[in-house]
Amino acid sequence: MIIDKLYENVEKKGCVCVGLDTDISYLPKGFLNKFTNIEDAIFAFNQRIVDSTFDVSACYKVQIAYYEAMGIKGMILYKKTLEYIRKKGGIVIADIKRGDISATAKMYAKAHFEGDFESDFITLNPYMGMDTLEPYKDYFKNKEKGVFLLLRTSNEGSKDIQYLDLKDNKKVYNKVGEKIENIGKEFLGNCRYSSIGAVVGCTAEENNIRKELKHTFFLIPGYGAQGGKAEVAKYYLSGGNGGIVNSSRGILLAYKKYDEEGKNFEECARNEVINMKKTLQII
């Protein structure tokens, strides 16, 4: 199963997931000026980030919104970025956050697990109900695909719904977590984690969430620019390999710490990943 490949990558390369949420404003001006169009510039930037971090990163998360906002040309850029990573043998998480009734979900599955926009994992929103997962299950079993379901996210507004108290002294996200854990047991890899993972932000700590979801691999956003703490992320990593920690702006804009002109932006990105790995290392 695909979760075994991701688990193995974490063992070999560390737990960092590089986020390619690439905005045109992130590109150094000197680099951008070498190109006649925005799409070529961003693709070249993405390539250099991937090449410089490939041996020290577990995987890459590509946020589709940054590409959708550019229209048709942006979606071609999105396709090229996914293909570039996968052809190198890398693992791609398409951050699409879909969630819909089964007939529509079937089309989302086809769109993002096959064809032009094929990826290894996608993010989904389970709050319409677990029946929305049904069209994806064949891909988990037979086509080496996986998902990360939104559980407890890193944004401030997550408290509006996810943190609501229930009658049994649990919160909404605890109940959703129980369902994710139970459904995931059907798709366990050799690593004993499921190809159905969960998105758990490291901007807030919750001790029981890791203990209760023993077979659920975590995608951990919020580190760095969003204020997520390394201590929280480490706990969710479950001894070093129970999840991946995503950073986007912190890596893509690392050059601004050392070299405002960004002449060596890819080297700065690599160093940021290495520093993240050291900070997150379980001692």
From Swiss-Prot:
Pathway in which the depicted protein is active: Pyrimidine metabolism; UMP biosynthesis via de novo pathway; UMP from orotate: step 2/2
Q: What is this protein called?
A: Orotidine 5'-phosphate decarboxylase
In this protein, the active site sits at 97 (proton donor)
Nucleotide-binding recorded as keyword: no
- What gene name does this entry carry? pyrF
Tell me if Lyase is a UniProt keyword of this record: yes
Q: List UniProt keywords, sorted A-Z.
A: Decarboxylase, Lyase, Pyrimidine biosynthesis
Please report a single Pfam family linked to this protein.
OMPdecase
Species name: Clostridium botulinum (strain Kyoto / Type A2)
Would you identify the family this protein belongs to, as annotated? Belongs to the OMP decarboxylase family. Type 2 subfamily.
What SMART domains is this protein classified in?
OMPdecase
Q: List the GO molecular function terms.
A: orotidine-5'-phosphate decarboxylase activity
Catalytic activity reads:
orotidine 5'-phosphate + H(+) = UMP + CO2
Give one GO biological process term: 'de novo' pyrimidine nucleobase biosynthetic process
Q: Which cysteines are joined by disulfide bonds?
A: none
Q: Which domain of life is it from?
A: Bacteria
Enzyme class comes to: lyase
